[in-house]
From Swiss-Prot:
Polar residues: compositionally biased ranges: 97-110
Protein name, UniProt field: Protein YcgL
Organism in which the protein naturally occurs: Salmonella newport (strain SL254)
Domain YcgL: from-to ranges: 14-98
One Pfam family, short name: YcgL
Amino acid sequence: MRQVTIPLIQSKSMFCVIYRSSKRDQTYLYVEKKDDFSRVPEALMKGFGQPQLAMMLPLDGRKKLVNAELEKVKQALSEQGYYLQLPPPPEDLLKQHLSSVGQNTSSADR
């Protein structure tokens, strides 16, 4: 019986390390290497505060990112060395309510 050797193929899967801001709620900083903020602007780091490790994540598409697009994250990491995820804009409940009230009254006038 002849043995067949199958070469191991190492995929160059991109990983990122995600940090939570100590100063800003729902703000996250993605970097390529753990504790390496050398490519992050100093002013951004001051506003971000002490980074708190949230998780390490492969960017191979198996896990969905929350509030971030995978391709934008990959592009930002390769081009500038970091990606900053800001919180989603707050819902304007008053505006939504007034809009729905306005729609209801205009349809009732007909």
